[in-house]
Amino acid sequence: RQRQMCIRDRDKLARQEPIREPGTTQGYHAVTFGYLVGELVRRIDGRSLGTYFKEEIAEKFGIDFVIGMNEEDISRCADLLLLSGKPNLLIQMVLALPNWLLPEQIKIVKQTLQSKEYAKAFLEIMEVDENETLPTDYPNSDSWRKAEIPAANGHGTASGIAKFFGILASGGSRNSQKMLNPDTIKDATTPKTTGPDVVLFQAPYKFGLGYQVDAPFSPIGMKEGMFGHTGIAGATGFADLNHKVGFGFTNNRQHSLGKLYRTSNNLAKKLYEIL
């Protein structure tokens, strides 16, 4: 059957009460964050977040990145080669074993996979039952690519991502055009919340206003003054305020969980060797 890939009832999201008392825990909003921010943009400016980004950022600064693709974009978009949606044998074993047999870190992974927070962030929002699996080719469908799902389906090139973060790393302006004020960048990249994150396996993620300021296991946080975001398949983009440089890595073949950010980590290390 056709699965709903995005929220269509914004009022339902607006009526949703916090799952936990605000300020008591940190829980990653895998999909809903983009709709919440996008609705603010739409009500203030009148344009959708995808249209606003296209007209005010992508076109003005020559950044090859879109939220909601047109036919021309689709014609040059690489297909994603995702891992099977079914739990692999190792995960199945972890879920089946009693907790007293598991190391503490593996126990945390198991508890997170079984938790309501994980299901709400990654499964229920996509209307997928925890016993179901999405078809592995759903990100390659035209309906997914054309939709505006700001927190999940932005499409772009590594150079486009690097250019975006490079502009932010250099003060927010380029060629006499301003993307963001330096004070706004400083505020947005100052940690506002810190893990352990109840969705992201209790890892000590640090978030600013949308940006990851420290993302364990990835390049983000290996140096002072870094901010950016990681992707579910292993993609990574970040800015380094101290070195005034942007970084972008994209991959169309999803990396396994144990090697998720291995390539971006290796590339980032080489970058800093050069710098």
What are these regions (language model features)?
Residues 1, 12, 35:
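Divalent-metal (Mg2+/Mn2+/Ca2+)-assisted nucleotide/phosphate chemistry catalytic cores
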Residues 2-7:
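Short, small-residue-biased leader/transition segments that mark boundaries at the very start
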Residues 10-14, 268:
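Hydrophobic core segments within long, regular secondary-structure runs in both alpha-
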Residues 13-14, 60-61, 65:
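Long, well-ordered core segments of solenoidal/helical folds
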Residues 15-24:
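Cytochrome P450 catalytic-domain "roof"
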Residues 23-32:
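Cytochrome P450
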Residues 25, 42-60, 68, 72-275:
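Catalytic loop of the DD-peptidase/beta-lactamase superfamily, centered on the K-T-G motif
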Residues 32-43:
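Hydrophobic mid-domain F-helix/FG-region of cytochrome P450s
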